Amino acid sequence: MRAEGLGGLERFCSPGKGRGLRALQPFQVGDLLFSCPAYAYVLTVNERGNHCEYCFTRKEGLSKCGRCKQAFYCNVECQKEDWPMHKLECSPMVVFGENWNPSETVRLTARILAKQKIHPERTPSEKLLAVKEFESHLDKLDNEKKDLIQSDIAALHHFYSKHLGFPDNDSLVVLFAQVNCNGFTIEDEELSHLGSAIFPDVALMNHSCCPNVIVTYKGTLAEVRAVQEIKPGEEVFTSYIDLLYPTEDRNDRLRDSYFFTCECQECTTKDKDKAKVEIRKLSDPPKAEAIRDMVRYARNVIEEFRRAKHYKSPSELLEICELSQEKMSSVFEDSNVYMLHMMYQAMGVCLYMQDWEGALQYGQKIIKPYSKHYPLYSLNVASMWLKLGRLYMGLEHKAAGEKALKKAIAIMEVAHGKDHPYISEIKQEIESH
């Protein structure tokens, strides 16, 4: 299949950025630029039973695979369509039992290898960019990253050798490096992790901290919509990262994961940085050094919490959140993004513990500064309104709930498109209350 391209868009060489995607026609806010079916994808283990493994539909009463009892499907059709991928894991899951634990990256990479064998020619996901062309940044990997790739390769051999042939080690290193910087995480309307996937044409877009498009998902289909007006000849930019944080933090993240430093307007002017690291107005203002120390503390505690999530109890996690907020509040305003980060984590722990009132209190403190720090149409803001709306509804605050859900819908109609199933579901929630 020859690359027939995408209507109104072209691949081009973006100065200083390598390949990129450029508009050939105007797009208005909310317009769908293109959609891209997943080249390969995998449902995350924690969502098994909630979503169909094949089409990612979320519903009650899915049927389970009779062999492994681990995969769930809408019906026989979905199960049959998924078999070429599921068979890579079906009997190994039974054989390994409790010891079956490949990472999601390994699971996705196994599926890419299977797909390449089944479908060596170009796919409808690769109209402008083929998987083979993905950037790997091999020359930029440090030893730690190389070691991580080698352990992924070992796991790939360990769990998948019965049903898959592998290329040599060097080719696998390249493939894992490509997956690491071109893979996507699929999230639901509340930004909960659903799975991982490869969307080659979506991966063609370069990054900006003031993006003009947003990527959302409809099952295993990625959709790209304009969140700013785009004129013919303009490059199409998405954001690779969470845009909450100040410039230095964003670029640390971009360098670490994607090996470049951003030079967008936001990174050049740093316009939002002052508000993002808002300092308390005290009669004796904190010294520059005290501020620097507190920023360093904040970054460390964020990393500490990220690691602690894997082994600490909810109450211990909540304590980290509360103590760190207390410490930071001596220097930082509540609207400071480091404070917001810990509030957001605390809210997540409250939701996990089903402490709805606690979660609501955190959400109420978060939403206003979120709306200020994030771009106009932001999935982070939409999902926060949605969580708030559902909490209000659950706690019988109907008027506040409806108002919050409508705020979520207003953003989602642009980001997800007016006809997205998520929007119908939320409207249904408003109706039924």
From Swiss-Prot:
A zinc finger (MYND-type) spans 52-90. Transmembrane segments: none annotated. InterPro entries: H3K4_H4K5_MeTrfase, SET_dom, SET_dom_sf, SMYD2_SET, TPR-like_helical_dom_sf, Znf_MYND. The modification Phosphoserine is found at residue 283. Gene3D superfamilies: 1.10.220.160, 1.25.40.970, 6.10.140.2220, SET domain, Tetratricopeptide repeat domain. Its EC number is 2.1.1.-, 2.1.1.354. Disulfide bonds: none annotated. Induction: Expression is repressed by CEBPA. GO terms for molecular function: histone H3 methyltransferase activity; histone H3K36 methyltransferase activity; histone H3K4 trimethyltransferase activity; lysine N-methyltransferase activity; p53 binding; protein-lysine N-methyltransferase activity; RNA polymerase II complex binding; zinc ion binding. S-adenosyl-L-methionine binds at residues 17-19, 137, 206-207, 258-260. CDD domains: SET_SMYD2. It is found in: Cytoplasm, Cytosol; Nucleus. GO terms for biological process: heart development; negative regulation of cell population proliferation; negative regulation of transcription by RNA polymerase II; peptidyl-lysine dimethylation; peptidyl-lysine monomethylation; regulation of DNA damage response, signal transduction by p53 class mediator; regulation of signal transduction by p53 class mediator. It catalyses: L-lysyl(4)-[histone H3] + 3 S-adenosyl-L-methionine = N(6),N(6),N(6)-trimethyl-L-lysyl(4)-[histone H3] + 3 S-adenosyl-L-homocysteine + 3 H(+); L-lysyl-[protein] + S-adenosyl-L-methionine = N(6)-methyl-L-lysyl-[protein] + S-adenosyl-L-homocysteine + H(+). Keywords: Chromatin regulator, Cytoplasm, Metal-binding, Methyltransferase, Nucleus, Phosphoprotein, S-adenosyl-L-methionine, Transcription, Transcription regulation, Transferase, Zinc, Zinc-finger. Changing residue 429 to K: Reduces methyltransferase activity on p53/TP53. Interacts with RNA polymerase II and HELZ. Interacts with SIN3A and HDAC1. Interacts (via MYND-type zinc finger) with EPB41L3. Interacts (via SET domain) with p53/TP53. Interacts with RB1 and HSP90AA1. Belongs to the class V-like SAM-binding methyltransferase superfamily. Protein-lysine N-methyltransferase that methylates both histones and non-histone proteins, including p53/TP53 and RB1. Specifically trimethylates histone H3 'Lys-4' (H3K4me3) in vivo. The activity requires interaction with HSP90alpha. Shows even higher methyltransferase activity on p53/TP53. Monomethylates 'Lys-370' of p53/TP53, leading to decreased DNA-binding activity and subsequent transcriptional regulation activity of p53/TP53. Monomethylates RB1 at 'Lys-860'. This is N-lysine methyltransferase SMYD2. It comes from Homo sapiens (Human). The gene is SMYD2.
